[in-house]
Amino acid sequence: MTRLQNIYREQVAPVLQKEFNYKSSMQLPKLEKISLNIGLGEASQNQKLLEEAVKELTAIAGQKAVITRAKKSIASFKLREGMPIGCRVTLRGDSMWDFLDKLMNFALPRVRDFRGIADRGFDGRGNFTLGIKEHTIFPELEVDRVDNPKGMNITIVTSAKTDKEGKFLLDKLGMPFKK
């Protein structure tokens, strides 16, 4: 069991149950998965860029990244159906908890001029999406060896029914939201 899982079970779960008046511990919102996505528009022309992104995302997540392909052809983007356009990873279980711990305690504080995350990333159902401009904030990547920094989307999927429950859960776990 990871450090963050212990915090959830021992500190966050009792507070959640009290705050939202849940009758059973099975009603408590919990983390289901974390999805990491790098979208590369230039990947259709530059295969080396895509291979580099897959290698870097695999290093960040600790799990092999899957190449995403275009669902539709779009002529103005010179894109054909089935062309590679990015990569993604879905984390669950212990690797999800480890990644969230690393994100909150190591990666986000390394962002330049970091003052907290805006809470606008909630989708209405308790899930939170966060965009990162440079993926070099993660400790697994050496800034000198990365040729071109890439942006990245991180989606934290919870079993919460509302944004209020989801934000409360992430806040108690230690997500650095703006005050």
Swiss-Prot record:
The keyword Transport does not apply. Part of the 50S ribosomal subunit; part of the 5S rRNA/L5/L18/L25 subcomplex. Contacts the 5S rRNA and the P site tRNA. Forms a bridge to the 30S subunit in the 70S ribosome. Belongs to the universal ribosomal protein uL5 family. It comes from Oleidesulfovibrio alaskensis (strain ATCC BAA-1058 / DSM 17464 / G20) (Desulfovibrio alaskensis). Pfam families: Ribosomal_L5 (PF00281), Ribosomal_L5_C (PF00673). GO terms for biological process: translation. The lineage of its organism: Bacteria, Pseudomonadati, Thermodesulfobacteriota, Desulfovibrionia, Desulfovibrionales. This is Large ribosomal subunit protein uL5. HAMAP family: Ribosomal_uL5_B. PANTHER family: 60S RIBOSOMAL PROTEIN L11-RELATED. GO terms for molecular function: rRNA binding; structural constituent of ribosome; tRNA binding. Keywords: Ribonucleoprotein, Ribosomal protein, RNA-binding, rRNA-binding, tRNA-binding. This is one of the proteins that bind and probably mediate the attachment of the 5S RNA into the large ribosomal subunit, where it forms part of the central protuberance. In the 70S ribosome it contacts protein S13 of the 30S subunit (bridge B1b), connecting the 2 subunits; this bridge is implicated in subunit movement. Contacts the P site tRNA; the 5S rRNA and some of its associated proteins might help stabilize positioning of ribosome-bound tRNAs. GO terms for cellular component: ribonucleoprotein complex; ribosome. PROSITE patterns: RIBOSOMAL_L5.
